[in-house]
From Swiss-Prot:
Protein name: Large ribosomal subunit protein uL15
InterPro entries (UniProt xref): Rbsml_uL15_N (IPR027386), Ribosomal_uL15 (IPR030878), Ribosomal_uL15/eL18 (IPR021131), Ribosomal_uL15/eL18_sf (IPR036227), Ribosomal_uL15_CS (IPR001196)
Location(s), subcellular: Cytoplasm
Keyword annotations of the record: Acetylation, Cytoplasm, Hydroxylation, Phosphoprotein, Ribonucleoprotein, Ribosomal protein
Subunit and partners: Component of the large ribosomal subunit.
Positions of the UniProt region annotated as Disordered: 1-37
This protein's GO CC annotations: cytoplasm; cytosolic large ribosomal subunit; cytosolic ribosome; synapse
Signal sequence residues: none
In-chain residues carrying the UniProt-annotated modification Phosphoserine: S68
Domain of life where this protein originates: Eukaryota
Annotated positions of the N6-acetyllysine modification: K47, K55, K110
General function of this protein: Component of the large ribosomal subunit. The ribosome is a large ribonucleoprotein complex responsible for the synthesis of proteins in the cell.
Main subcellular location of this protein, as a coarse class: cytoplasm
Length: 148
């Protein structure tokens, strides 16, 4: 239901007239807009708008990150990357197809030569092989396949 009087008429006789008792309807006591960000409004800008002032450095386009990232796995842990069932089946089929172990799928890039391999051929796929790892894999009749 619309009121009979306008808001102005209702507020007549009230000291503050809807403009509060602190600021008292004065113009722009803190400056207009973002004024004083480095001076009297410094605390607010530092807390709620960090990085608003100052310069930012240059962009490095086509930056190659993680060039040295190369997780490694040793030969003695190689068979833990596939299921036990795969290893048992490979041991039974002496003249069958050699199982393929893709170390990149397990999150490793390089195969190192620590430890011994069981005397059964295996095909290992990796991005890098150490010299000793390659010798040991080929020593049991396996093969090293380089993948990108």
């Amino acid at each position: 239901m619309p009121s009979r009087l306008r808001k102005t008429r209702k507020l007549r006789g009230h000291v503050s007239h809807g403009h509060g008792r602190i600021g008292k309807h004065r113009k722009h006591p803190g400056g207009r807009g973002n004024a004083g960000g480095m001076h009297h409004h410094r605390i607010n800008f530092d807390k709620y708008h960090p990085g608003y002032f100052g310069k930012v450095g240059m962009r490095h386009y086509h930056l190659k990150r993680n060039q040295s990232f190369c997780p490694t796995v040793n030969l003695d842990k190689l068979w833990t990357l596939v299921s036990e069932q795969t290893r048992v089946n490979a041991a039974k089929n002496k003249n069958g197809v050699a199982p393929i172990i893709d170390v990149v799928r397990s999150g490793y890039y390089k195969v190192l030569g620590k430890g011994k391999l069981p005397k059964q051929p295996v095909i290992v796929k990796a991005k890098f092989f150490s010299r000793r790892a390659e010798e040991k894999i080929k020593g049991v009749g396996g093969a090293c396949v380089l993948v990108a």
